[in-house]
UniProtKB/Swiss-Prot annotation:
EC class: hydrolase
Cofactor(s) recorded in Swiss-Prot or TrEMBL: Mg(2+)
Active site: 23 (proton donor)
Species of the source: Streptococcus pyogenes serotype M3 (strain ATCC BAA-595 / MGAS315)
Catalytic reaction(s) noted: a ribonucleoside 5'-triphosphate + H2O = a ribonucleoside 5'-diphosphate + phosphate + H(+); a ribonucleoside 5'-diphosphate + H2O = a ribonucleoside 5'-phosphate + phosphate + H(+)
Keywords: Hydrolase, Magnesium, Metal-binding
Keyword hit for Hydrolase: yes
Name assigned to this protein: Nucleoside triphosphate/diphosphate phosphatase
Family: Belongs to the Ntdp family.
Residues binding Mg(2+) 1: 87, 103, 107
């Protein structure tokens, strides 16, 4: 499959472990693709929930997906600074329809002031039982929480101010073509 290129628009589909569609983002602009990663941006992007509800993202957000890490990162660019929403999720795969991944409930939120919170621990516990996450899966996800927190603490990749500046600037250049 041919990788999307800079300026292309793609759909992103989030699934649950049982295979059910969880959420869809329409028209994410691709900023960069490599063999293992995709960087994009959502800006007033239509989101459709599994129950059919629809909403539109409020602010520009740089999105980061990787084929080797069990998380993806959304950097929301707001007036008071950048805040992050990080999904513990399978590495992504891409087909002709969309970029796809499995959402594993746990999320890490990083506020603009640097405060970090692990979210949806109860939901993870419920789904772990209902959808029968294996012990290996549980271990992988918990290890990836540690990796993610390390990235946050060391301002690695998407958590670097320079990264956000570079990719947001590139988005504005592409948007205004």
């Amino acid at each position: 499959m041919k990788l999307p290129k800079e300026g292309d628009f793609i759909t992103i589909q989030s699934y649950k472990h049982d295979g059910s569609l969880h959420r869809t983002w329409r028209d994410t602009m691709v900023l960069k693709t490599t063999e293992n990663a995709l960087i994009g941006v959502n800006d007033h992007t239509l989101v459709t929930e599994s129950d059919g509800r629809r909403w539109v993202t409020r602010e520009p957000a740089i999105v980061y997906f990787h084929k080797k890490y069990w998380f993806n990162i959304i950097a929301m660019i707001r007036d008071n600074g950048v805040s992050y929403y990080c999904n513990l999720a399978s590495p992504y795969m891409m087909d002709t329809e969309a970029l796809k991944y499995i959402d594993y409930d746990l999320d890490v939120k990083v506020f603009a002031d640097g405060e970090k919170r692990l979210l949806d621990v109860d939901e993870y516990g419920i789904h772990k039982k209902e959808m029968q996450y294996s012990a290996d899966m549980d271990f992988i996800l918990k290890e990836n929480v540690k990796i993610l927190v390390d990235w946050i603490n060391h301002e690695k990749g998407p958590f670097s101010k320079a990264y956000i500046t570079i990719w947001y600037k590139r988005y504005l250049e592409l948007k205004n073509r």
